[in-house]
């Protein structure tokens, strides 16, 4: 990571500065605690950049800890993908990877301590009854009939829960706090529930599993976390976080701070809804280039640096706000405009025959970047038969159309001026071939007689071009806030993926997966990291040359 990316300013960093200056903490210790029940998305990337970035900038530590307390929804596949995403984004965690399940024995002991203090009880209400008894924002809850059990009875029942003597959903351990609290999270929250499921780390050792709110704070304390950073939806949960730590024997009491979550327009961040997109086969998988997942963005052609830059630009605040998709797209567009080598690709080809070109193949020198000579150049074959894009030719056009028109001239990029003389069509009236002449004295220079040729179009040699599948990706949803729709699936953009079969210049034969290029006049593309091969080239559009959605929203 470059120095330019370092040291942003936000309210959390101000808190860290104050804590270090006052001596409250001698060093900084943060953590990133994802649940391994799905792939990380751009919202997680914001949290990663915040937690790991603070640890890096203050020469502290940041743990990677998996909040693995629900074996039913978790999988080792997600564990491995999350580790890969964190490393790909450019960060390293401190020490070994940690798991909340590492602390299951200690968590059980702390639960027993709460029971012994009369602060937890085994409840045999059904989950539906617990919800009913909890009350609402306007009505207080009411006590469970099992709330008054003795310490001895609760200890015995909790042991039975651990031994598998209760069926799932028939008993749970709850904190004894205040059923009339104005904060619903404090109305005797569940601490442990029963799940007969094999755990990816602990196997079948446990059939009771701690809840997030009980696990999270204790794990932070056991690891000596100094600043526990969460998104705003956990603001009320801070009361429970502090209550648990205040009522058990543990030397460390971290402080939780909340920041705004990332709400990205034209995207969905809910894991449940993202999973639905996958299971309903609306997308190819979690790494579909239209998904807001880190793996999807990577496959689409986003770089780690562009995602870090985006997270720095949007900042860290206490107020939820919506971020425009164009802000994310601008970060990768700016980077690729600066760094991506140029290449020519024809997405919707029509054949051009240059009738007065009698020589064989000529190699034309092209710069890899128009403003960076240090990136070198390449030799591109030019021959009698070429392909141009169908949109670059019209039989008739007005003066604003600066491409190839029947009877008029246009320049081929870094090559010659050609003139459309006649066309050939098939039985359906579709143009199959454009017959042209060329001016042999115009290789990368103006005509000698001073005539003006305004348009420039790209091309590839028909003999040497490589067939390629070109996937033109766009925003997955057609409205800025798909989550607000009654059925978010009805807002899917039908044009979010358009597959074209075109041709690319031969220099792209060995394009490496995720390698970015600017296809001149088309946009930024990369070789697909799943399907592209030397035998079958597949390129994904990362982003267009300019923001076309800005016109739609105007």
UniProtKB/Swiss-Prot annotation:
Protein name: Glutamine--tRNA ligase
Enzyme class, spelled out: ligase
The EC number(s) this enzyme carries: 6.1.1.18
Reaction catalyzed: tRNA(Gln) + L-glutamine + ATP = L-glutaminyl-tRNA(Gln) + AMP + diphosphate
Binding site for ATP: 35-37, 41-47, 231, 261-262, 269-271
Motif 'HIGH' region location, chain numbering: 34-44
The protein's assembly and partners: Monomer.
Species of provenance: Serratia proteamaculans (strain 568)
InterPro entries cross-referenced by the UniProt entry: aa-tRNA-synth_I_CS, Gln-tRNA-synth, Gln/Glu-tRNA_Ligase, Gln_tRNA_ligase_bac, Glu/Gln-tRNA-synth, Glu/Gln-tRNA-synth_Ib_cat-dom, Glu/Gln-tRNA-synth_Ib_codon-bd, Glu_tRNA_lig_a-bdl
Protein family membership: Belongs to the class-I aminoacyl-tRNA synthetase family.
């Amino acid at each position: 990571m470059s120095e330019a990316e370092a040291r942003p300013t936000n309210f959390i960093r101000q808190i860290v500065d104050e804590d270090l200056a006052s001596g409250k903490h001698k060093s900084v210790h943060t953590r990133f605690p994802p649940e391994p029940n799905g792939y990380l998305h751009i919202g997680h990337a914001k949290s990663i950049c915040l937690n790991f970035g603070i640890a890096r900038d203050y020469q502290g530590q940041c743990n990677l800890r998996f909040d693995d307390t629900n074996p039913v929804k978790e999988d080792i596949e997600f564990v491995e993908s999350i580790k890969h995403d964190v490393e790909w984004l450019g960060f390293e965690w401190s020490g070994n990877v940690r798991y909340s399940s590492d602390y299951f024995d200690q968590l059980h002991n702390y639960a027993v301590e709460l029971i012994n203090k009369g602060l937890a009880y085994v409840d045999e209400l059904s989950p539906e009854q617990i919800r009913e008894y909890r009350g609402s924002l306007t009505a207080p809850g009411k006590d469970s009939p099992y709330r008054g059990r003795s310490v001895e009875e609760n200890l015995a029942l909790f042991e039975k829960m651990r031994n598998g003597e209760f069926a799932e959903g028939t008993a749970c351990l709850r904190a004894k706090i205040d059923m009339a609290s104005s904060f619903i999270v404090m109305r005797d929250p569940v601490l442990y529930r029963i799940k007969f499921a094999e755990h990816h780390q602990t196997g079948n050792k446990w059939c009771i599993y701690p809840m997030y709110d009980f696990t999270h704070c204790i794990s932070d304390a056991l690891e000596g976390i100094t600043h526990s950073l969460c998104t705003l939806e956990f603001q009320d949960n801070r009361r429970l976080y502090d209550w648990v730590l205040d009522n058990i024997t543990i030397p460390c009491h971290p402080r939780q701070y909340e920041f705004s979550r990332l709400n990205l327009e034209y995207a969905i961040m809910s894991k449940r809804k993202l999973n639905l997109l996958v299971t309903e086969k609306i997308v190819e998988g979690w790494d579909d280039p239209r998904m807001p997942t880190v793996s999807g963005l990577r496959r689409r052609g986003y770089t780690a640096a562009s995602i870090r830059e985006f997270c720095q630009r949007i900042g860290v605040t206490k107020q939820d706000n919506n971020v425009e998709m164009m802000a994310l797209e601008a970060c990768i567009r700016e980077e690729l405009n600066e760094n991506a080598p140029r290449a020519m690709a024809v997405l919707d080809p029509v054949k051009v025959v240059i009738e007065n070109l009698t020589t064989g193949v000529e190699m034309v020198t092209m710069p890899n970047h128009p403003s960076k000579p240090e990136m070198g150049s390449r030799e591109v074959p030019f021959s009698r038969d070429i392909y141009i894009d169908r949109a670059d030719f019209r039989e008739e056009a007005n003066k604003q159309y600066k491409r190839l028109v029947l009877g008029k001239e246009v320049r081929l990029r870094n090559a010659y001026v050609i003139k459309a003389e006649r066309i050939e069509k098939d039985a359906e009236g579709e143009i199959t071939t454009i017959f042209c002449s060329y001016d042999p004295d115009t290789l990368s220079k103006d005509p000698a007689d001073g005539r003006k040729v305004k348009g420039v179009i790209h091309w590839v040699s028909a003999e040497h071009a490589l067939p390629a599948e070109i996937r033109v990706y766009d925003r997955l949803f057609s409205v800025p806030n798909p989550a607000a729709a009654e059925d978010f699936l009805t807002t899917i953009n039908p044009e979010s993926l358009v597959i074209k079969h075109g041709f690319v210049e031969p220099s792209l034969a060995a394009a490496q997966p995720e390698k970015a290029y600017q296809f001149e006049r088309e946009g930024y593309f990369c070789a697909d990291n799943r399907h592209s091969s030397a035998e079958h080239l597949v390129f994904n559009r990362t982003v267009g040359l300019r923001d076309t959605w800005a016109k739609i929203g105007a």
